[in-house]
Curated annotation (Swiss-Prot):
The chain crosses the membrane at residues 183-204, 224-246, 254-277, 284-306, 319-343, 378-400. K(+) binds at T367, L368, G369, Y370. This is A-type voltage-gated potassium channel KCND3. Residues 6-21, 70-78 are annotated as: Interaction with KCNIP1. Residues 529-548 have a biased composition (Low complexity). Highly expressed in brain, in particular in the retrosplenial cortex, medial habenula, anterior thalamus, hippocampus, cerebellum and lateral geniculate and superior colliculus. Highly expressed in heart atrium (at protein level) and throughout the ventricle wall, in lung and vas deferens. It comes from Rattus norvegicus (Rat).
Amino acid sequence: MAAGVAAWLPFARAAAIGWMPVANCPMPLAPADKNKRQDELIVLNVSGRRFQTWRTTLERYPDTLLGSTEKEFFFNEDTKEYFFDRDPEVFRCVLNFYRTGKLHYPRYECISAYDDELAFYGILPEIIGDCCYEEYKDRKRENAERLMDDNESENNQESMPSLSFRQTMWRAFENPHTSTLALVFYYVTGFFIAVSVITNVVETVPCGTVPGSKELPCGERYSVAFFCLDTACVMIFTVEYLLRLFAAPSRYRFIRSVMSIIDVVAIMPYYIGLVMTNNEDVSGAFVTLRVFRVFRIFKFSRHSQGLRILGYTLKSCASELGFLLFSLTMAIIIFATVMFYAEKGSSASKFTSIPASFWYTIVTMTTLGYGDMVPKTIAGKIFGSICSLSGVLVIALPVPVIVSNFSRIYHQNQRADKRRAQKKARLARIRVAKTGSSNAYLHSKRNGLLNEALELTGTPEEEHMGKTTSLIESQHHHLLHCLEKTTGLSYLVDDPLLSVRTSTIKNHEFIDEQMFEQNCMESSMQNYPSTRSPSLSSHSGLTTTCCSRRSKKTTHLPNSNLPATRLRSMQELSTIHIQGSEQPSLTTSRSSLNLKADDGLRPNCKTSQITTAIISIPTPPALTPEGESRPPPASPGPNTNIPSITSNVVKVSVL
């Protein structure tokens, strides 16, 4: 054995240093790691729009949906792609985030929809790039404020029945259209505000001269009349302020509010003037107090939506206005200093100091140019021209931002008012539908008023249509949907008074026990032939509808003691014929029952696979004339010829 080892050992050593191979065949390659995933292209289908990217691109962020294994739940084995039923426009920004690592906010997208998409993909909005983050935060804040206002208005409407006296009074002050008394008080205060402002202006107009003195203003010549007007206005303003203070939810916040301060400043000069004497030492202070009466004009902001929107605009543009003020201050100081030293050598110069040059700089930068101070030297004229041009640039920059904010806030308020009006109209229509009877439903069915998406705008025609269109229509349509979904059968409309015989197809019958006995009794009182209703037609083995309610003819029931209104409603009552589902190509569904019937269809009654079931419309309320005059249901007589029903009965609740 030692000899054998000695024989091949030199060859192994020679092969180790590369002199000769150990074997004639090459050695096999090292086994590859099969678990190592190769990079590949994957397809992301977002609502039909296909996106392609590398798998490693998505795996950069494993904490998100697309970067984790959770995306495998959305993999489609048939198409070999990931399908997401989401917004494809927002997904472009999401995919660019995986590619570049920067998340951007598209300004044309709704902020709520954008947040929902980011939450779905597991991306935090805090990583939005600096170029879009300010815009995103502004839109987020505006949307939150708008939603807060909508929620407050909805809460006020929902909690209306349980409001206290103070809450009712505060609601009347904030929304004068809630009651007639609040609306009257609203217009009365607005009238006295206008009278107060006009009085403050007219009392300074000269009203003739007095012998031996100069012209007297109207306020001094007719002092008693103006004092009475001022007293009446101040009394109204005082009562309004005290009532608002009493009804305010938080009196501390109300006192600190801007409008409360304006109210106090508007009425305090009158009371201070009553206690002040005509001493010359205090006459200057009295004149100063009378100047504050002009602030009463700001009380119009409660009566003007445009003024309130302007205030909101200035508040939202506080940063832009601060930038404008800071820029103007810097420019005024710089150009005032330059103009002072440029005009210092001129003997007739009016630029005596830098603060005196402020006036020229302000007037020049605002492009007013009164001409009371003008430069005399060439250097002063050059710097004055530069000051005028720079003022145009500095002032013009923030103006488009302020205008755009005003337009945006104005349109938001307009849309909010429109939504509140539409919601109020829908609630009123539902309230009318709840108090309506079955005749209103049948009347709307007969006239084809089935447009539930109608929005009321205040016209008399639309108001009448809103009253006749009730909620029962949508409930009836939904019930028929559920019946077809449960049984797999098609439903056809027919007249119950022309055919009340029952036959079984698949042991299904839908019947309302509330009116079954009375319908049987009424059908036994008639002597109609036992033929099928002419409201059914057959075409190629399929059954379609031909609603007989479209005809205007009224059929009077013989030997019936029921009122005429009840007979008409019973003639308009519908039954539902059920056809077996052996034929898979049925073209009639429950959704067509609430549509207008095709008047061009020819009635044909040669079908045998029909069974009759009755679904009754709710009986009129006891408060209606029909409910009062309708007799109680009687048991069927002995002559009632109705075959026994051996099928299962499915009881349908009354709509």
